[in-house]
Amino acid sequence: MAFKDNAVELEERVVAINRVTKVVKGGRRLRFAALVVVGDRNGRVGFGTGKAQEVPEAIRKAVEAAKKNMVEVPMVGTTIPHEVRSEFGGAKVLLKPAVEGAGVAAGGAVRAVIELAGVADITSKSLGSNTPINIVRATVEGLKQLKRAEEVAALRGISVSDLA
């Protein structure tokens, strides 16, 4: 789901910049690919990729793509509602809620997504491939799977107190 209101100030973080080449008859064509995560630190986060001949232009394109690719992250206090595992390509990510004050125990690309989503207390583990784009996609996929207790109760047709 895309969010159209640009009134909210979004923070952006460049996760990776790669130099990519296309081999043509006359030699190599050099371009830059950027992976950027944007978020409002209040439950909304997105990522995007951009490619251009100059790094700043690639980053600008990635930011525009990220703004069109925002997801809502349900939170319980400063953490996530429940444990979740997700995969994308060869990358596997495990996200676990943590007690208040524990901080963000996550590395690299996962940390960027989690911090910009506004989650203050979480534990994560990246397994399998450590390619930044696949790690980011797996993390966002995991955040999409999260559901609050009220949503689960409504889906099952029972009250929240019966959810034990």
Swiss-Prot record:
Protein's job: With S4 and S12 plays an important role in translational accuracy.
Record carries keyword RNA-binding: yes
Gene Ontology molecular-function annotations: rRNA binding; structural constituent of ribosome
Domain S5 DRBM: 10-73
Complex formation: Part of the 30S ribosomal subunit. Contacts proteins S4 and S8.
Alphabetical UniProt keywords: Ribonucleoprotein, Ribosomal protein, RNA-binding, rRNA-binding
Record remark on domains: The N-terminal domain interacts with the head of the 30S subunit; the C-terminal domain interacts with the body and contacts protein S4. The interaction surface between S4 and S5 is involved in control of translational fidelity.
Family stated for the protein in its record: Belongs to the universal ribosomal protein uS5 family.
Recorded coiled-coil stretches: none
Protein name, as recorded: Small ribosomal subunit protein uS5
Pfam families associated with the record: Ribosomal_S5 (PF00333), Ribosomal_S5_C (PF03719)
GO biological process: translation
